[in-house]
From Swiss-Prot:
The gene is htpX. Signal peptide: none annotated. The lineage of its organism: Archaea, Methanobacteriati, Thermoplasmatota, Thermoplasmata, Thermoplasmatales. The active site is at E147. This is Protease HtpX homolog. Its EC number is 3.4.24.-. It comes from Thermoplasma acidophilum (strain ATCC 25905 / DSM 1728 / JCM 9062 / NBRC 15155 / AMRC-C165). One of its GO terms (cellular component) is plasma membrane.
């Protein structure tokens, strides 16, 4: 395990703990202010199980909803990509010391890949038709190494758990605001309720930062578990962004503009294969681009230039 991998693992772990601690600290502070009355505690005891159940249901059945949205189907032996993809996924799973996930094809043109799963659906990795068209097999292997990192690190479960915190805080504040049981502290309780609802919004930025760390951690996983993974993942990322025809938003001319995540951009862009020829130029620009600390503040993925430069360091280590 590299020093960078250890640092990202510890940083995201500490941030996750901090999110839980701050979240429940806010709830405790509200309860303390209003006197830990039975009604407020009962409200919390009702809300918490409800949202935990909702999270569990989303986790268990989410893969089926994802499959419906992105028109995924399990890779069949009759498909031309079967041997190549099963060989790649099997090898990368073996390198990561985890059981081989099921391989799915998403019948969409946007170049992308994603890892998901649940105890009911099992672990899955899906690649889109668009991705298969623009990447070489060794680049696909690097992308699979990234997605395998998400499965290995249990990122889906972690994000669902952490995402519960702002939701709980919001509805706790919302219910207090309209509960009608404020007594003499009516003004203070209304203010606390509004602060709690505002805090739940600000928590989203912490969760985005947490997710960016996990994405970087998955990049490092690919670099460490796939031969030549760092270089191939760099090329794959440049090709994917170039193929969307939206490269302008990541060039130096606009480096101070907060960017959307690569995944979000892919979900909302139509592929432009003619732009693919520019990926080498784009890659070289990213290697030396000076990116603002806040360039990806509103994104759930690191700015592509940050990812490329981190992978460049791994190549040299």
């Amino acid at each position: 395990m590299s020093l960078m991998s250890i640092r990202l693992k510890l940083s995201s772990l500490l941030m996750g703990i901090a999110i839980f601690a701050i979240g429940f600290g806010i709830i405790y502070a509200i309860l303390y202010y209003i006197g830990l009355n039975i009604g407020a505690i009962a409200l919390l005891m009702v809300l918490l199980p409800i949202f935990i159940i909702m999270d569990i249901v989303q986790w268990l059945f989410g893969p089926y909803m994802i499959g419906a949205v992105y028109r995924t189907h399990k890779l069949q032996p009759t498909e031309p990509e079967y041997n190549m993809l099963t060989s790649i996924v099997s090898e990368v799973a073996r390198n990561n010391n985890i059981r081989m996930p099921e391989v799915y094809i998403a019948e969409v043109d946007m170049p992308n890949a994603f890892a998901y799963g649940s105890p009911i659906a099992g672990r899955r990795i899906a690649v889109t038709r668009g991705l298969l068209r623009i990447l070489e097999p060794d680049e696909i292997k690097a992308v699979i190494g990234h997605e395998m990192g998400h499965l290995r690190h249990r990122d889906v479960e972690m994000l669902l758990a952490i995402g519960l915190i702002p939701t709980l805080i919001f509805y706790f504040g919302y219910t207090l605001l309209f509960s009608g049981e404020r007594g003499r502290n009516a003004g203070g309780i209304v203010l606390l309720a509004i602060i709690a609802m505002a805090a739940s919004f600000l928590f989203r930025f912490l969760i985005l930062a947490f997710n960016r760390m996990r994405e970087s951690y998955a990049d490092v996983n690919s670099a460490l578990t796939v031969d030549g993974g760092a270089e191939k993942l760099q090329t794959a990322l440049a090709k994917i962004v170039a193929a969307t025809g939206r490269t302008g938003r990541y060039t130096r001319r606009r480096r101070n503009t907060p960017s959307s995540s690569v995944t979000e951009m892919l979900f909302f862009s139509n592929p432009n294969q003619s732009a693919n020829e520019d990926y080498r130029k784009l890659l070289e620009e990213w290697k030396t681009a000076k990116v603002s600390l806040f360039a990806d503040f509103f994104s759930d993925h690191p700015h592509p230039a940050k990812r490329i430069q981190r992978l460049e360091k791994l190549k040299m280590s």
